[in-house]
Amino acid sequence: MPRSIQLFSASAIVLAGAFLCIYLLTPAFAVGTMITEHPAVAFCAAMVIAGLAWLSLLPILRRFKLSPKISVPAIIFPAVFVLGLLLRILLFGSESVYENDYRRYLWDGAVTANGANPYEYSPSEIYEASKPGASSVPSLARLAVLSNVEADGLTNDINSPVLTTIYPPAAQGVFALAYWIAPFKLWALKLVFLFFELLGLAALLAGLRARGLPLSWSALYWLNPIIIFTTYNGVHMDVLLVAPILSALLWSQRRPIIAALMLSLAAAIKIWPLLLAPVLFRQWRDKPVIYFGIAGLIAVLTSLSLLPMILSLDESAGIVAYSANWVNSSFLFPGVRDALGLFIEDPNRAARYVIAAILTGFSLWLGFITPKDPERVPSHLLLLAAALVFLSPTGYPWYFIWFLMFLPFAVSHWSARGLALLTIGAAAYFARFKMGEAGHYNIYIRVLLPLEFGIPLAVLMWDGLKARSRV
């Protein structure tokens, strides 16, 4: 057996062992337990080991493609698929570690499935209307009954309950599907996420095959511990973006209308994928009728899909509060904000405008200035999505899915090593809770967070300088 295959197998075994440890540790983080008693060090160590095992796959997978002496056994991809699937199923029964966004998903799904508008009332309004003697309009009263009878007080445990939902309509449809399968059951939400992620994996495999790349490179997505853990333990919904975005990538060169439909669907799940459009469709920039037709189609479809959110915008809208005020675990944003604060009165808002301008400019540069070479499209999407994560006011680990979905297409690209390192540093995010409880949150902000993002960024910049002629 070739040494590369042996190393690949060893890495997979270590990854599986680390995940088993993670699973066994999660009951200690159950709701009601004391944060000071949580085994945070052991948990973070297991996450780092899982990240290192996954990272070790990168040079091995490169050799699968680049070395003609290595014959990749046909069993490699099926083994990767089975292992990734088993790790996901393992976490179906785990206790969520420091995350409760899923409560909003469960509630939104119930509201949507019952024919109500999730952007109309906040959970707090519904909770107050459920109290005895409260008077309310009929539609609010109906949701109050739902809260009391079915949700068992869930509305009182949701993050930012005074705000209406932040999640766009297509995401609401997914939440509603989980409700129809099993109302207010977390396993139903995970099952629906798994179904859509399998569609995303199919799009990834089709894209790799279309580009003549090894299917085994899909392991960088399918076995990534951050993707697996934040989706099936933390139950975050960003994995829903993978299928439509990678489908748009698959069809962008041959069937631009289908690609436009897929990108519009992604924007109806989360709005940011619109940033990818100039890169995805740059091959058509010399054909104005097609190019502007694609742009118009995306604009119309996205506007229509987001119309329920747009019509409900006010001070209690989650999307308004998030875009204006939210800052959490951010790396570069605070520096931009503080620098602007030396010159203007509202640096928080100004920093968001500056970062939006930087990202838009980067997207347009990649879309209009760089060569149209279709082989570089995935690596440019990787860089663009990573720039968004580095600059975002919120730097949550589940946002890493935004660029990790493109990594299997860019195994040989200079950016792969630096961006892959973020998977290891993500463990710092989970350390912050116990550190905060112990009064050491400043250590997380001033030491761990800069290390989490700074080391990968330094490696990324170094590798980029060495390959500056190959953007």
What are these regions (language model features)?
Residues L332:
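Short alpha-helix
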Residues M1-V327, R337, E345, R349-V471:
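Multi-pass membrane glycosyltransferase architecture that uses lipid-linked
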